[in-house]
Amino acid sequence: MSKARSRNSLLSSSNRAQFGNSTQDELLKLKFSMEKPDIGLYPLNDLDNGVDLNGDNSRSQHTAGSGVLSGNEVTYPDYKPWKDHTALPNDKKEQEHQKLNNAAYLNKGYFETPVVANEYYSARNLIQATVFSSTENCNEVLKELSQHLANAYKTRNEIINKIKYESNNFKIPPRVTLTASKKESWLKDLANPDLALSKIAEKIPHGIRNKILIDAVCNKSVPINRALWFTKCVLFGELVALRRKHQSRMSLNSPIPQSLDINTPEKFEIHWLQEWTQQVADYIYKFSKESSNFNTIERKQYYMNKMTYLLTYIQALYVEFLLDKSFFLALIIKFLKEGLPLDPLHVSELLSSTRSETDDLIQESWIEDLDLNYGQRLFALTLIKIFWNDILKFDYICKELSETLLLNYLFISKINAYSFKQSHVQNHKASIPEPLRQKILDMIGDTITYLFKFNTNVFIIPNYWMLINGVLFTILLNKNVTKTEGELDEISKQFDLIKYRNESLILNMRNVQPSITDRATPNSAGRRGSSIWNQSFVSAAESTATKIDIFDNEATFINRSSDDILKIISQLDSLKLNDELANFLKPVTSSSALTSTAIKGCPKWRTNLKVVLYWCITRHRNSRESSEDILIICNFLKRKVLQTLGPTRSSSQLKAEFESEILDIIYNIADTNSSKVVNYDLYVLINELYQLKVLTIASYLRKLIASGIFYVAPDAEDNILNDNSNSLVKTHLSILQNLPVINNRQCDSILKKWTSTGFNFKEKFEMGQEILKRELIDRIVNNTFDDQFESHIVYVKDLNVGLKFLLVNWVTNELKSAITESPKLIHINPLIISNLFNFYSICDNLTVFFKVLVKFILKNEGGMIIFYLESLYLIARLIIKHFKLVKFIAGNSYGSNSTAYELFKLIIQNYKDCKTREFDYFKFDQVWNFIDTAVESNYSSDKNTDSRSSGKRSGIFNKEQFDSPMKINTSENVIAKMEDRYTSADFRNDLDLLLESTFQPMDSNEVSEVVATLKLEFEENEMKSHRNVVPKVLDLLKSNLTEESEGLAAKLLINSQYLIKSDDVNAFDKLVQDYILELVKSDMEILLVAKFLKKLIVHEIIRINDLFAFFEPIAEDPAFRVKLKALMFDLVIGLSDEEREYLSNSQILQLEIMRQWYRERSTSSFLVLILKGIKTIEGSIFDCPLMEKYGSSIFRILNALIVANTKLLSDELISKISTEDSIRLLSTLNNENFTPINSLQDLERIASEVDEFNLPIFQLLLRVLTIKELSPLQENEIQERLKVLLESFLENLSFGFTPMNSYFGELFIYLPWEYVVSILGMLEDKFLCSTTFNFDQWDNDKSVLSLTNSVGNTNLLPVFNDYFKKFSSSSSNVVESSSSFFQALSKFLSKLLLIVNSDNCLEDTFEDTSSAISIFLRILIIHKLTLTRLIVTQDGEQFQFIKNLILLINSKFIAEGNEKLRILLYDLLLLMKSSVTEEVSKQTENELSEGTSPGFGMTAQSPPPVEDASKITEPLSSARPSSEAASFQTNPISTYDQVSSLFNLPEPTETNPFKDYITEDRVECALTLSEDELQSGGDIHGFNESNLVLISSSNDSTFSGAFALITNPHQRPKGQPFKLRSFEILEGTSTTSLNDGCINLQLFDSYTTKENPP
């Protein structure tokens, strides 16, 4: 046994000598160098037992949570230094004195009571002595002790003190019903940032949700963090309530939810979030529409403050993911489209206006009255700017944005701007100031330009491509933005490609207008171009019956590509001569660069020029009354084509080449069938081109001599002109006789040799000079003109064209000299103007009339003056009527002021002068409005603005897009004298003043003077009421008045009209209507009634359409029906010989102007009037008296209408005229002397006569004859008959221009739809089954593939390519697809794949192979609405057909041969991807809905891997037989994966072609949220940081060894990302429990503890 140790030995160290005094010193130093702690420390048992450190049981003296005596200094636990009684508080001093008197202290000394009962058992001294006894095991012992202590703590925290998952008590504040006042008080408290949120967060008001919630936080300007908290509480509460309802509903009839089920929680919550997003968008939309409702500064300021807050609130919601982002962005764009006139009727009108130029005067008023609600659009544009960086991430949203912005740009530029200086703008509510509108247009234009450069694929927008393609081109060529030559070239290239893609796929959006919100799914974003076709064409096919077809039967519009020959002809028919057409006629040059005014020449310019020149001379356009159209075309070629080439050396070569091509075409014309050519028009064409210096006579003669046709002179006995076998020689001899030459030895020599008498140019010219000197020049100088002038110049009228051109130039110069030298002042009156106009018109020289003579007259120089407004008004009306010619009259250079602008300036100057001398009762306001529309409107008079600027009064379609407005050249002629200068600013200012001017009625003196002159008699008080004046003046106009008296009567009547309408708008019309109806009902002869009405029309008291409206009350009265028909025909057509008896030449001109105005703006009514007029109850229309009287005029009118309004005439013919009469009428229009066409067999006989110019006649003949003959037949007989008809046309194909772009594509377009589909099927079968393939690469004598007609003389591939292209662009109904058709497609594709990878296809047969592929793709486009279902049902396991299409796009030919075909196929495959996916989804839903057990249709087996699309190298076999389709079932999951993998297509272009040109300078905005704000801003991003993960906790410390944590330091459990949804992140406001936050503390292995800090 060991000896018991003493107390001192136990307390001492076992090796005491080792420490010595040094250890004691160190301990003493530590003891007395203790620093005071910074925080209150306490022993654990003090708080538990409430024991005071000095023995007091009361806890009242403790500080909260510190354990330190109140007033005492902080100190360490178990350390209680003695303090003298002087340092104690007063209440402790007495206790201390008592202790000092204690007897124990006196006997044993002072000591402190131990903390524990036995100090020795605390082991503190023992452990301390043991640990410090040796340094050998000190570290190991400390480490082991520390490990045990750490394990003890860890076990206590994880087992005893750990916060349990069940302890979480998070609840959103409950909703309680409050009174209105309390609810308002609560919202005020919420908006008060000084009031703690915890005080009001115990409950939230019930009933504040959706738009009410947004309005509440906006009205109260709640701080954003509190507004977000309130929003989250409301949203969370709504979601919880919806979840309960959903779960209760699903518990009744819910199998195990499938992955595709729409009722899964994920999809349910997406739907809930989208509903909330819709509410936010609706509130924004409503708020934006209120922007124009405030009328005070206070309301405006309140609105602006609220808008600022709303924008901030929306940004916070967006950044915090409290909105469905893609859905919200889609709704923003929807705002921009809301309110645009995109209904079928308006779209059709807008499309029609692009191909016709009937907008010289404003016709439709719906554009004028359109209110675009700019507040709504500005708010949407602001939001687009804010979220711009996110919008760029969604390609399908960018696509919708690009289309919407283009449409907005289009309509905003068409609506008048508001100006406080211009009251002529009527709709001020729908207008905004011009500077603001221009800024909006600039912003939209810059955004569109950036989108185009960012991703051109987003401009695949075929919906309204025909409407907005010109707008896009105008924006891209913005003059205000400097562009390099390379950038302009790239823009041109990419625009052409986008244009091709849109025009190729234009059928895709014909039957459905899907809302972008239907496509805005959260997973829709992808790579560039991947979401072009988010809306499946399967759904489009099924929704055709319910969706709006913008091209319905009543608003039909044939879509044509811009380079289509038929479109060029259509532009020529409507004289829609724009820059685009000019570009198609420019010769090709490699050095020409794309500039703002001209682009590179067209490769097919020769063909296009041939079309233009043939149009000028074809007999199918001979319905024109004069040769003015030819003059317009010639001036257009000069000004818009040749002058834009510039004066460079290369341009001179191009002009020479252009002249040479014209001569070649003339020779070709001379060699063609003369029955299709009007020779007189050919002579006019040649003479005008010569006069414009486009070609020279010398060049023509050199070419003629070089041709050798006049090499051998004919025998004198056998005159060549009598030899019908040589029409070429006769044609050129006729041309020579009509050339404007005198004393040309070459010409005279040829004519002398080849004609019996030659042609004496000089003699005829001198005779014409003598007549014109006597009948024109002398009569003007002597003021002896009369209305019989035309009868005096019959000789001149019958001269050859060339001599008339020479005489016109001579008489113009002589007339100017005679007037200048005349000693007396010559007054220009309407008689002189009308006779001069008629003379120049007869001589086919209106160009000289307007360019030289009218300008000379208006200048009032050289003894000539326009003294009265009557003459000026006639000149103005003539300029307006012939404005198409005037605006293209070429000057010395392209940059010089146009003739039209010069004439407009002179008209305004003359008006200002004449207005001071007489009362203006003419309709000059129409003249000013027309001028304002025609010229380019400059906001700043001193600067040339962007070409995108539109006129203040632009009508339906101002001329900026399709026909650029006539530009005002602000650089004045430096040669002009300073005092004579009339600048463009002066012009603009004067025009604005005239637009502002109002009608000034005559004063009483003027009225009395007119009444006295007309010898009108009134009672004493009759003159006080102008209603009494009207009948008497009308009575006076019925009598035979002189022209001067008629003018005075019209002046008095118009004055009364204005004064009566100022009191009652309809009163005057009612007076006139009653008077006219009484006149018609009377026994007065029709001729006299017509004479009276024509005078009213001439003086513009009433217009023709108003007059016909007056007839409506008696139109159906049998007693007046015949009389009204005759009267109306006389008014709209008339006979010139009859009218000359009672109307002057100037009045006849005015009447023709009004007739033209009526025909152009009331085309439908005019046609119905004609057809109803010639229709008889019994007998043929050709026996109708009106047809006998006006037959030639009716045929001329119908000939013009059938060209310009084919669809209208087709419908009206069938409904108004019998079939036999329709056939005979059309046959006569085709050829008056031709054998009538009575049946389809007759049509087959003349099939070779069809061409591009008579196409409309044959289209209607086909329609009428097929309806007549095929309707009674059975289906199989109809098919056989149509097949014979089709074969007859294919065997007799004849193309005047090119088979790749011809009439055949639209030949059958007006047939009934079932016949059109039948012909389509026949052509498809012929292509798919009759195309021959040559697989022998060594057989070079055969084409790789070919398709010819049965005769074998025509290659049908280019013909079919053109047909299917035009069919896909213009058809508007769904084409069905059969199983046999799909199999034929598959077989053809398999053969085609063998061809496209061979070397032969890239050599001699490139065009045929391209045509075959193009045809195949067009067929897919036509059938795409019904083809998807066949692909899924018959080829749904392997999708071999689609794989073969992918092989085609990866083939050698597509990759190396044709970029356009590759892009088209790429677009088509993207379309198929979405369609196939939707079809698979639809079939899967049907299967799931038919299942009876949980998990029906699901499988656990993984699908086999699908080959990557880009690695397929061999063609696959065709689709499975349809018999297997019935038993085919797909695994939905594997099918989705297969489709997704299969369509993993490479981008068509790897790099952005604009990467070197794209800049953000013009789209940057201070409001735009940066990428950092979008990705890192808000609480949602902080809580969902990628570094935060969830890992499984390991609570094993209780059962592990002491060194468990040490032995495995690198072992870490697996983790998962930590995610919280935005509405779940709520600020904690409760103070009642520990674990009541939105995040459960158990997720962090949290525990509770109460201990001193280390």
Curated annotation (Swiss-Prot):
It is found in: Nucleus. The keyword Repressor applies. The keyword Transcription applies. Residues 1515-1530 have a biased composition (Polar residues). One of its GO terms (biological process) is regulation of transcription by RNA polymerase II. GO terms for molecular function: transcription coregulator activity. Keywords: Activator, Nucleus, Repressor, Transcription, Transcription regulation. Pfam families: Med12. InterPro entries: Mediator_Med12. GO terms for cellular component: mediator complex. It comes from the Eukaryota. Residues 52-72, 1481-1530 are annotated as: Disordered. Component of the SRB8-11 complex. The SRB8-11 complex is a regulatory module of the Mediator complex which is itself involved in regulation of basal and activated RNA polymerase II-dependent transcription. The SRB8-11 complex may be involved in the transcriptional repression of a subset of genes regulated by Mediator. It may inhibit the association of the Mediator complex with RNA polymerase II to form the holoenzyme complex. Component of the SRB8-11 complex, which itself associates with the Mediator complex. Belongs to the Mediator complex subunit 12 family. This is Mediator of RNA polymerase II transcription subunit 12. It comes from Scheffersomyces stipitis (strain ATCC 58785 / CBS 6054 / NBRC 10063 / NRRL Y-11545) (Yeast). The gene is SRB8.
